[in-house]
Structure formats: structure tokens, C-alpha cells
Amino acid sequence: MATRGNVPAHMQASLPALPAHLQSDTHITAHLASRFHVSLPTARLSSQGLICLNTFTSSTRGPNGDKEGSAMGEPEDLARRAWARLGNRAEDQAFGFFGESGSGKTTVRSHLLSSFLSFSSTPLSSKLSLAAFVFDTLTTTKTTTTQTASKAGLFYELQYDASSNNPTLIGGKLLDHRFERSRISHVPTGERSFHVLYYLLAGTSAAEKSHLGLDGHVNITTAGTGLSRSASVSHKRWRYLGHPTQMKVGINDAEGFQHFKNALRKLEFPRTEIAEICQVLAAILHIGQLEFGTGQATLTAAEESGGYSHEGGETVTVVKNRDTLAIVAAFLGLGVQDLEESLRYKTRTIHRERVTVMLDTKGARENADELATTLYSLLVTYIIESINQRVCAAEDSVANTISIVDFPGFADHSSTGSVLDQLLNNAANESLYNTCLHSIFEKTAEMLESEEVSVPATSYFDNSDAVRGLLKHGNGLLAILDDQTRRGRTDVQFLESLRKRFENKNKAITVGSATSTMPGSNFATTNLAASFTVRHYAGEVDYPVHSLVEENGDVVSGDLMNMIKATKSDFVANLFGQEALNTVSHPAEKTAIVQAQVSSKPLRMPSVSRKKHDQLRRMASRRADRSPAPQEEEPLPGTEEAKVRRTKPTATGLTQGAAAQFLSALDNITKSLTAPNVNNYFVFCLKPNDRRIANQFDSKCVRQQVQMFGIAEISQRLRTADFTIFLPFGEFLGLTNADGGVVGSDREKAQLVLDSKHWPPNEARIGNTGVFLSERCWASIALTGSQAAAYFGGDIGSPSRPDTPGHNPFSDSKARLVGSADGTPGSFYGDEAKGGGYFGSRELDAKSDAGASAFHSGDMFRNLETKEELAEKGNKKKVEEVDVVPVSSSRKRWLAIVYFLTWYLPDFAIKWIGGMKRKDVRTAWREKFAINLLIWLSCGLVVFFIIVFPELICPKQNVYSAAELSAHDGKGKHSAYVAIRGQVFDLGAFMPNHYPKIIPQSSLKKYAGVDATGLFPVQVSALCQGKDGRVDPTVQLDYTATNISGTAAVISSTDANRKYHDFRYFTNDSRPDWFYEQMIMLKANYRKGSIGYTPQYVKTLAKKSKSIAILNDRVYDFTTYNEGGRSVRAPPGEEVPSGVDTDFMDSLVVDLFTQRAGHDVTKYWNALPLDPGLRSRMQLCLDNLFFVGVTDTRNSPRCLFARYILLAVSILLCSVIGFKFFAALQFGGKNVPENLDKFVICQVPAYTEDEDSLRRAIDSAARMRYDDKRKLLIVVCDGMIIGQGNDRPTPRIVLDILGVSETVDPEPLSFESLGEGMKQHNMGKVYSGLYEVQGHIVPFMVVVKVGKPSEVSRPGNRGKRDSQMVIMRFLHRVHYNLPMSPLELEMHHQIRNIIGVNPTFYEFMLQIDADTVVAPDSATRMVSAFLRDTRLIGVCGETSLSNAKSSFITMMQVYEYYISHNLTKAFESLFGSVTCVPGCFTMYRIRAAETGKPLFVSKEIIQDYSEIRVDTLHMKNLLHLGEDRYLTTLLLKYHSKYKTKYIFHAHAWTIAPDSWKVFMSQRRRWINSTVHNLIELIPLQQLCGFCCFSMRFVVFLDLLSTVVAPVTVAYIAYLIVLLATESDVVPLTAFILLGAIYGLQAIIFILRRKWEMIGWMIVYILAMPVFSLGLPLYAFWHMDDFSWGNTRLVRGEHGKQILLSDEGKFGPDSIPKKKWEEYQAELWDAQTQRDDARSELSGYSYGTKSYLPTGSVYGGGYNDTQHLMMAPSRSASQLDMHPTPMYGGGGGHNQSRMSLAPSEMLGSQSNLMMPSGRSVADMEMSDLTGLPTDDMLLNEIRDILRTADLMTVTKKGIKQELERRFNVNLDMKRAYIGSATEAILSGQL
């Protein structure tokens, strides 16, 4: 239409109405600009399309301030027109939206939806509006271009019942198409994750935040710096929420959360379910906060495996913030340990094998991200499906639909890094755009052509090439991607598939090169940036293929599914029980979920319109179905067909990848949009500029979008053909009320009507059967009254909503995108108060509003389970099986002791404070505590014995003999002591304080070391009260008249200085108390002790007529008193009074000391008839006047015993070490053993070791200088696990080392394992072959424990002990001829038939660890030792460290390893009882040499060592900590007549822990295992020796030394202190003896020229406190550090224990067993029945029942292969030198060699050659009656074997030749022929 009159050009809203010269991109852009600048941001593409520009301001304001012409008004107008067509024509209406991110597409879509819902203002329309809000809340985000970016494909369907021209809304349906899942874990810079996560964080109350764990302070580690800081949650950086600034971008998150909860409530979600939804959202946020680090799994578990380097615990990834982990576990209803275990491991399917990968920190983080993504995906699906269940109408009641299709905008790059999301969304846009082009160009042209109407052709960009290349079924790009995913192909293979498909075949897709050549290199390498390019309608996009195939798999690991099975949360269980989660079950066990996949397509499909009325069918009857060729119909979700398709297995287990599912969903959309009765509208949303500036129009930016969408071409097309309605002539004439009187055909009548209407030719044309009209023309004739007014008159009669500027999403300016003013992504749907928006009118659903307001006003989790209750519930184990087990009497006695020692610790305290919920764990803790108490008591007793006990026997005496006193003479470094009246004082300390000061110290020092009693005369009357209480002051007593000490060091009474201390009564200066006062002062400050007299010396003095005796251990001397020492003196000038009694001592006392001189008179003293007063006075006189010293008992027997007890202990210890020293010296030089012919098995258990370690171990075993034919290398792989740092599972690494091709894939077979419940049923695979390394060709067998199909995490893993038991139990059953499991039968078959050795021939088993390297001569030396001593059952060699210098931790262990072997084990070897032969390097005797009686595999050993119920502390320490030591214990226990020895000539090197934590854990295990095993050994009666020379004494000594090891450090420290404080020779001697220990050790390594051990010894001595103090204390306290598994004991009735397990109950009958003879007979039958034409017999497998080489890399050990059963990679030239038969012959060399297993060496040739040169096939058979006798057969067999080639002859061939010779069928004699052949070949006949 041209612009009329003075109407401005910009007022023309319809672009096709512009003149033809204005139809270019530039002119259309200019026209849009002119409208944009007058606030008209919209334009029309006639009636078929709408163009909206984002103004970044209000979307509701047009040029006149109202909504007309605005981004809100035009969609309303479009909705009214579509509504009119829906009501009047009963057509389905569909709207397709196009636009880049930031173009306002989501906003326009919301206005359109709101308009339709406003036409039906019912509670249902309100719910549908809320449903759209919930969808957007879950799937929209803020990007750099808009605050409301849709990140999920939406197909929103409104359902109507067309009962009248005003259709009734009866339902709705939300179909979500794969939201951008990668955004959950990878939020792009400057963008946000999905809005609901921010809503939750901002909108919850304080109580709710507390429940959800979103409050409080946390430590944040800054990326890159590693620095931690404390921050509150409001500023906390949430990994899944992007940068913290994204929480403050103008969006009202808090209000959004309230709207979200309100919407769910109005959608009838229960309150508890909304709370659960919030908990899952919180759990997702917390998963993002999990921090992973590398730690050591030091808790001991039964499944542990590996060598010495693993014994301290394997390196695992751990969660550092356990509190956050606990929150996640609580909300998911899981146990914390289970969740952590699931995050650190991931099970994948590699080459049809399930393999568990031990993840590093990066892998664990990705695994956690996968969990979060899966949770959010399932939550979104669950909420949408729940909404659909509430609002969707029944399919058969739906007459018409209105569909809104909106996919995320086209993207030329992926902001989150997900190429798959980018590819699928762009493919969806491509498909939708192609539908648009088809609808406007092709569909119209087809209709016109069918009616023979011609219109001018219009050129346009056809994207069909891109659509076909991307979306074509079978060989489109998405189909190829999905096919490659299902086939398990790599990215490079996918790229090559694209190249074959598209190169030079589709110009829209270009495939890049998979290889690239680096500059300066001539060699092509893998192109890490390989990509393919798609030419989209919007431009070319490069898609990198890296990880695209894996991402398309979209696999949810089986570990996660297995973990969720145990959830206690019904809601979480429902999430994972949805149909959207496609599970893949194991083909062999349907209950085992191997993996799963979250569907990328909606659970529902677009509704199929039901044509219930004739009016609805009128158009369909006349319009041809021109829809595309039908594809394979997609089954309806939920139907049986869908389920069958969903579970169809493929190479990877997946039925469809994300691409195929998305493609299927796109097909459904395309079918829906192109259905015959659907009218399509297309809305093109454009952004005016790239900088989000309001009211700014960038012509270049807009022109690019106009070109991209082809708007100019569409407009030109509509200028020539704007036809959307076809009316048959009758219907057209009826609508126009044409004059019935006009004569002519309907066509002529219609032509007259058209002529009268003057409609332009591009809007009205006549065809053969009807009239083509535009929508405008149709409306002018079909609509009347209010409908016409509404259609043409804008707002007339419109129920649309008035303008609400307060809640407009465009109301912001430059900085805002299309979003809401208040930041709520839902509020652009209108103001809730005004109705018509998401939340509708307030008067609707008032009850729901009330409920919702009450719901969000406080705490939504009120009256629900608390976080702690959820955690306890999640950690609680499910009990499945109950078993009653008896309690032994010894166990009862021990528990009685335990409770006696720990009764004061209440059970509830252990339960709540210690966190031990399980009764058996608490019991173990009590046992541990009781054992620690006993150990501490033992240590205390040792300390008491060493330190306290000697003091009790001989208390320390501070006495000095005369000689000792004289030594303290102050000369040199000697101290200065002096004696006064039996008391010794420190003269050196006193001299500075002597008064007066003028006396020089040199004068005082001359008294040092002497008895200075003579210097101090005493006043008798002041110191003694005499017989009657008083002594005359004139009485004097001369004390110094006699030298009683027997030395010259006595000061006489003539000393010049005596006068200065003489203050007696007769002097001028009488001070009676002066001496007493001075003695009090000296005793208080300077006393050192007393003069000591031995009893012997007292007797000696008595013999010299001295009146000296001992009273109460004090020595008194009456010699002076008796020999005239008494006198009477008065002061000068006074007369001596007469009658003075000088006998102041009672005569009885004097007589006692005179008559009993030299003796102890204590008992006589006590017997004296003295009254108490007199006795007291006599005692006072004795102490003050006659005391000369105390009894010196230091040399008494009692004190000598106490004195030498330390020396005795040292001598005892040194004697043991001395014995060890001589034991170490008793070995002679190395002897070169002879060549040996014994068969040896070398077993290597493998777990998660790296390839280098495994190769070193396997190569060292293969290179041992021992006859290769008599060695069998058996590797047992413990589970399908990829260790950290490995790129393949351990079994694959082992098989690659041994040269086994990946094509060899034997069937897994059942066998018994050590495990709880159903874990006892395990499955394994057997491989065998020959391994060549450095000239050695060694037969090998690999047993891979793969686990049952139901095992998801770490399948097959049961631990190292179980790996040992696989071989031990097999040999046990071989030797006892017991029924075997399928795996054991296969092992027997491989060894006997393939390798060619009877398993009973093997006599010894060498066990080495996978991280151990053995010396070449080790096996030879060990076997030699066995042959020299037939009573030897176990031999170990010397193990050294191969990583000695890795760290200080390993350096500490070098010397300890050396002496533990060369001293300890050598010493125990003297007794023939090495208590621990280490499992890393030990050889065992399998059977007795003479009798063949099983030893190592005897019944008792197997029974005890295979104990499954390991539920007590003692049993766990025995079987889980040190299985090798316990195995040695069992050997000594049950085979007491046999010996275990140590041979230092056999060497091996192992890897020791190099980190402190692992070292501590390893030694904890060793120490505790040692204690518990020695406790087992001590009661044994069979240990050799007598008394202290018995092994029991050595065992007890070892146990004691282990228990009291901490005291040894204290003992040495005590000796050092004694040596430093005393010069006594005893501690010095003891210390010298202990020092000699290391001297003896030094002699050993000097004699052996181990000079480097000097340095290692120093390091070891420095580390002594660690080994002897730190490690034992740590070990004893951590004795109960175990992984307690899922089986626990509780106390039942009558003293029994009830065994509770959640692992199920194992039935032994579930594993079939049969004897070898039965199995052998089956083999023979299978061989006989085989087709004669078969040229080669391969191993007949128990598992496969086929002739395929089960597990063997060669086709059988007894055929005529020239290459001796080598792996395919082996060349013949390598073997032709010595074609050693393995072991049945040399192939083409025709050597007559008998097999070591004659019964099975016979192979099968299709034509056994006879002496005559003819073959069996040439012989004719005739029927004869009667059979030949056995003798006749025997003779003929001998004749045949004499001339036949034994390398190719078979039993069957012999039977055939016999039948030829006797001309009779010999099936009846088959058994005899076989046994006779065996007997002849073995020499028995």
C-alpha cells in the first residue's frame, strides 16, 4: 500500500506496503529507524509477521504515550488476530520467535502470552501464566546483553475446546527443550547462572538460611593466591553463582523468590515439596562450594589392595570442607561417606568393560559439577512435569491449540564452553527459520501451483542445505554425532565420519583437518583444535570437536545412580525415578544400572488435535497433505514401545545421545508447525544497538539483523503473494453474502465479488476450486460486530491490560536490558494488582494466596525435619539381612575385662561425644581403650621397675665415707665439703657468708675435705639434760681426743682457729647455745648429708676397743666418754664446785654401747628399762654429743640389687641383640645353586599401580634365572579400576605389558570372594599366554576380578587377601580334588590344557607385590633352601628400599629395614620361626615334598585365612592390617613341625611410603598387627626351645618390646640423665652396652661392605623418638581406625550376637561347582562332537561352551602352530631358535616330546596322517559285529604312537585310526582309548 495524503511515511506499519524501490535491506532499515525515532519500535510483515525493536525503555509506551504501536501493543494486536482465526476457522495457531540475545524476544513473548491468557480470565489462565513464570525463573539468566536471557527451548501450548467462536481455554502444556546445562557449573564472566539460585540466596529468611546452611562465616580460598580470608555469606563467593557482583545487578532477587514460592503454591505444589525443592537448590549451591584435595585413605578397609607402598593407605581425593559435604548429604538423604566416595570415584564403560576411575582433584570437581548439573536438570524436569500434570488437558478433549515456540537466540560462540549446547540451539534456530521460509515461500507456492495461480517468483536465501546437513535422519550431522557416541567413537573418528559424509557433498558444512603439521616439523600430529564449520543462515560458525562426542553422551555415572538408590529422601528418589532419566541396565542383570542419561527432549509431545466436529474437518477435507515424508514415528513417552526403545543396548549402553533426542524433539515441533491445520506467525525481535543504549538506533547493527533474517526477501514475497487463507468457492460466497440471483459458476461469482472488493492482487486471487485471501481480506468478510472492531480497531472491546509503567521492563535507560524495573524477571508479565500477568488477579484463587502468604511469611521448614535429623537419617544404614552368630567363651571373658576397665565411660557419652552411632563400633572403641589402658599400665610397670622400684628397695642416701669426704677438698673442679659432728656441709657455699669477712677464703678452704669437729667445742649442759634433767655447766666432754674416722683428715683440738669458736662456760665469753644455733643455721642452708659408716667398718672400729654402735641406723661413739674425756672446769676466778657428777649418761646406756660395741643395738635399746622421760633425755644427749654419722647401706645386697637392675636390663637386651648379631654372622658366603626342576608359581597382585611399577615387577619375575618352563607367572588384578595418574584400568595395563590383544575378551565367570553378603559372589576373567622379555619366554595367567553386573563402583575389588585367596583356594581344591567354581575350572583348563602343566605339579609359590622388584637369583636361592630343608614351609628374603632418597621419611626407614631383616628375622630364623614373612617377597611350600600333603593350601589355613566375618577389633587387626603376618601365624599354628626362615642372599627392592601421613598409617597397621598376632602366637604349645631359649620367650620379648617401646626412649633418656648427674660406673656401663648395640650392627654392615649404612644409621638414631615413642603411641590409640563396612554386630538374646547386613545374603548355591573330572569329560565330549573340518582346537571354555580361545592369546597349547602359541604380535623368527613346546611339542620340528601334562597335550588335527600317507578321510567304514578287546586296542595304540608325530596327534585322531583298522565304531571304547593313550605317554604302560 502506498502512503496516502500527508500521512508521514513512518506511519506505515506494514513493510510489504512500502514501494518496491524501498524493499532493500538498506531502505527497510531506514524505514525501521524512522519509526523507531518516533517511538514506534514495531513493524509488520503484513499479517504473517511482526518486527519488534528493543528500545531498552518501557515496552508499553507508544508514540502517544499509550501502548499502541509499542512492543506490548503490537503483540496484543497480533494475539487478537490469531484469536479471531482460532475462533472462526478452528485453526491451530503457532508463533515462532527469532532474535539474538538482547533483542527483547523473551519480553515480547511474555506480552503475547499474557494477551492470550487475558482473553480467558479464569483461574486456569492465571495458573498458566504462573507456569510460564516458573519456567522462566528456572531457565532464564542474565547475560552480557540482557537481564532476561532465555537459555532453554520453549514450546508453550495453550489448549482450547472450540465449542463456539469464542474458544474455551481448557489446559496448557510446557515443553522444555534442553536448557543450557553447562551454565550450572561454568558461569561465564559478567553473567549469571539461572535466576532461581540467586532468588534462593536473597529471598530466604534468617531461619531458612540457617536450615539451608546459607548463613554464617566461612573461609574462602582466593584462586591463584591460595590465601584464605573470612567472609560472611552476603559477600561469599559461590562458585555456581559467578562473581559476587552479579548478585547486585539491579534484579530484585528477594522479591523474585517470594513470587516463585507463591507461584508454586498457586500451582498446587504442597508446602513440603516446595521446601524439598529449596533444599535441593541449596544442595546444588553447596556442591559448588566443595573443595577437593589430595589425602590418604588411612582408614583400613577389607577392599584394600596393593603392595608395601599402599599399606599405609592409598592416595585419594578427599573433600576438605566436610561440613559443607554434610549439608549436601543431608539434603540428598545420603550418608556423608557414601557421597564422598561417589565423588572421588567414577565408573565408565571402556571397551564394553565397566571401569572405576580414581579421580584426582580436578576429576572430582568435574564429578561434583556433573552431580549438580544432573540434580538441577532433574529438578527442572520434575517441576515442569508436575505443572503439566496440573494444567494439561486430556488429549482427546483438545480441539485446537495456540503454540509459542521460542529457542535461545543464535550464538556464534559458546559463552559457557559447551559446544553441544551451542550446536543444538543453533540447529533449533536453523530448523525454525527453515520452517518460517517454507511457510512463507514454499507452502504458499505449492498451494498456488495446485490451484493454477501464477505469481512472480521471489529469490531468497534457502537454508535447506544447512537443515539437511544438520538434521537429516540417518546421515545428518546430529545423527552422525549420535551414532558415533553410541558406538563409543573418539572425536577424531567423528570428524572423519563427517568428512566422508559432507566433503564435496554439502556446501553448508565444511570439515576441518584432524591432523596438523607444526612449524619446523614434517610429521603430522593430532590437531587439538580440530573443528567443523556450519554455514548457518546467520553466518558461519566453527564448532570444535574436542570432547563433543563425550558431551553428547550426557552420561550420568552409575556410581551416582547406585548412590541415589540408598537415599532416604523420597523427593530425591522421585527426582531420579522420573521417565526423563533414561537408565541403562547391565544386559546380564537388569537390576544393575550401569549408567543413565537425563533426557534432552521434553517428556511430552505437542497435542494432536482431535477433530470432533464437522466444522473442524471442513478444511482438512479439501487440502492435500503436503507435509514432508513421514519419519519413523516417535513413540509416546511412557508407552511400552518407548520403554523398549529406551533400554535397547548399544556399544556404550546408550540408546540415544543428546543430539538424537533433541533432533527427535525438533521433528515433533516441525511436524506441529507444518501440520495442515496450523497457521503460523513469526515474530522477529531486533536489537537497535550492541551497547544496550536506550533510544539509540545503529543502522549497521540493525541492517545486519535484517539481512540475517531475510526480512527484505520476505517483504518482497508478501508484496506478490500474501495469502494465508484458502476458501472454497461455496464458503467464500457464503461469507460474502453474494447475490444468489447472479447466474454463473461459483468461480465467476467469486470473481465478481473480488472485483467489487478492489482488493490488491497480492492479497486476493482466484484458483480452480477456491479463493486465496490474505488475513486482512478474510477478516473484512468473516468478522462482524465486536470481533471486527477488536480486529481492526485496536483496543475497541479489547480485554487487554492497561499500561502499568511502574512495572515496565523497559523503564530503565542505558545500563538496562529488557528486564524489569524492580529486577524481577517475572514482573514484565504485568502488575499483579492489575491482573493479566503471571500472577493474575488477586481475587482469583484467594485461598491459594492466603496459603502462600502464610507460607512465605516465616520459616518454610518449620515443623519439617531439621538439617541434623536429615543428616542422621541419611547416614543410617538399611538393614536387609539378619544372621545369628554365637559368641565364644574367650570373647565373653575378654569383653568382661573390657567393661571392667571402661565401666566409668557411659555408652551415651561414647555415642554422642565420639559420634559412634553403631554398637559394634562403640564396643571396638572400648576394646581399644582397654588395650591402651593395659599398654599404659605395662609401660607404667616398666617405668616403675626401672626408676621407682630401685628407690623402694634402696632409698637414696646422702652419705659420704671418709674417702668420699676427702675427695671434696675444693681442689681443681672438686667441691669443698666439711664434716662437723657427723654432718657434712657445703663449705664452698658457706665461705662467702663467713663472719667476719676479713678472714680470707684460702684460710677457710684448708678445712675442705676434713672432719672439722675439733674446731667447735660444745657446752654439754646446753646440749644434754643428763639423767635427772640437768647437767652442771662445769662438766666438759672432749670429743676430739680419738681419731675414730681412721684418717688424718681430722682437725685436732690444738688448731689455732679453735679458740674463735669456743664459747663454753669456763671461757670469758660464755654462749652456751652458740653451737646449737650455728648447727641449725648450717643444716638449714648448707647441709649435704651425713658421714656414712658401713656395718662392717663399725665392727672394725669396735675391734679396736672403740665403744661405737648403731642405733636406729645412726652411729654413736662413747669412746671419749669412757676413756676420760669428761672433765670439770669453772670460769677463771671461780672454784670448781665439789661433788659434780660427770656421769651425765645413764649407766645402762653406757653399758649397752660398751658391751655391744660394733653391733646394731636398736632392739636392746628398746628393751632397756627406762622411763619415757629418761629415754627421751638420753636420746637427746646421744644425738647432740655422741652422733658421728649414719649407717651406709649403699653396698648392701639389697642396694646392690637395686643398683645393678639397670645393668641387668641392659645386659638382657644386649644379649638378645648379641644373639641376633651372631645369627646374622652365621651365614656363609653366597653359594651358586644348581639348576632346579621344581615348578614354581609367581603371584603378583595388582591394584592401582602405575605402568612402570607393574612392568618392573612383572619383568623382574620373568627375568629370574630359573627354568622358564617351570615358572608360571600369575597376575591377579583386583578390580576394574583406573588409578590416579593412569590412563587405563590396571588389568588393561597388565594385559598390554604381557602382549594380550584387546580383541581377546573372555566371558566373566563366577567365583567366591571375601566380602560381606552378596559381595561374596564375584566374577572374573582368565587370560593366558607366553610373555617374552630379554630372552625369557614365561607362561603367564592373568585373573581379572571384574565383579558382578550389579557392581557399579570399583567392580570386582575385594582386597589383597582375596587376591591371594583366588590362587590359594584354587590350589586347595586342586589338591583335595574338590568341586570348583567356573572361574577355577577355567584356570585349571588354562594351566593344564593351554599352558600344558598339571596344576598339582607346582610345588612352590613366590608372592611378590606389584611395586616390588626381585633379584634374578632370588627364586633359585629360595627353592634351593627348600630342597636343603624339607621341613621348610616359608622363606623370605631381604627387602630393601628402591626409593631410599625420595624424602626424609624414606631415609628414616632404610636402616630400619636393614636391621629388621639382618638382625630380627635372622635371629628368629635360628629358631626356625620367623614370625612375619612379608607378603611382598616370600616363597611358600604348596605341598609336602615326600607325601604331597597340602601345606600352604591346607584346609585349616584356607578356612582361617578366608574368614569373612571380620567384625571384632582383634579380627580386623589380624586380617585387615597385616594379612601376611597373620598368614605366617597360621602356618606356625597349624604346621608346627615346619619352619619359616630368612635367607639374606635373596634380595628384593620395594617402595616405602614417602609421606608422613602414609608412613604413620603403615606403621600403625604394622605395630597393631604385630601386637595382635603375637597374642595369637604366645599360647601355642608347639613353639620350639626350652625356657629362655624357647621361641615363646622370643615372641613374648617381641610383644613386650612392641608394647613398651615408648618406655625405651625414656629408659635411654634416664641413663643419659644418670650419666650426667652421677659418676657411678653402673649407668655408664649400661649406656656403653646400649651403644655397643649399634657397634655390633656396624660390624655386620662393615663385614658385608655396606658402607652407606653408616649414614643411614645416623639418620635412624636421630629418628629413634619417632620409631620408639611417636609411632607406638599413635598406633595404639588409632587401633580402631577401620572402615567398618555395612555389617555390624548387636547383642541378641542368650548371649548371642546378631549380624546385621545391608549387603544382602549370599547363597553358596548361586555359584555352580563341579569336579575337574566332570568338566574334563565335557571337554572330551565337545572335542569329539566337533566338526572334522575344523583345523584347530582352541580352549573349550566353561564360561563360553565354545571353541573360542577363552582368555588365551594363542589358540590352544597343543596344536601344531609353528609359533608356539605366541601372541599375534610375536614374530616367528624370535621363536625358531628354541621351539620349546608349551608344553606339548614343537610344532613343525617333529620332535617327540611328551607333555608335562600328557593327558591334555593332545590336540586335534582335521586329518591325522597315517603311516601309509593316507588320511582318515580316505578310509571307508564298514559295519562289523563285535568290538576288539582292550589288549588288542592297547597294542594298536602303541603301534600308532610309535609312528605318529606326537606334536600333532590327538585322542580323537587315534580313535579314528583305530576305527579304520578295526573297521568298527569305537564310541563305546572312547574312555578306554583316552586313558590308555595317557598311560602310554606318561610311561605307566
Curated annotation (Swiss-Prot):
Residues 609-621 have a biased composition (Basic residues). SMART domains: Cyt-b5, MYSc. It is found in: Cell membrane; Membrane. Disruption phenotype: Leads to hyperpigmentation and loss of viability in stationary phase at 37 degrees Celsius. Reduces the virulence in a mouse model of acute infection. Causes cell wall integrity defects and subsequent abnormal yeast morphology at 37 degrees Celsius. Does dot lead to compensation by increased expression of another chitin synthase genes. GO terms for molecular function: actin binding; ATP binding; chitin synthase activity; cytoskeletal motor activity. One of its GO terms (cellular component) is myosin complex. Its EC number is 2.4.1.16. Polymerizes chitin, a structural polymer of the cell wall and septum, by transferring the sugar moiety of UDP-GlcNAc to the non-reducing end of the growing chitin polymer. CHS5 is required for the sustained growth at 37 degrees Celsius and is of critical importance for virulence. Especially important at infection temperatures for maintaining the cell wall integrity of developing yeast buds, elongating tips of hyphae, and random sites of expansion in sclerotic forms. In the N-terminal section; belongs to the TRAFAC class myosin-kinesin ATPase superfamily. Myosin family. In the C-terminal section; belongs to the chitin synthase family. Class V subfamily. This is Chitin synthase 5. The lineage of its organism: Eukaryota, Fungi, Dikarya, Ascomycota, Pezizomycotina.
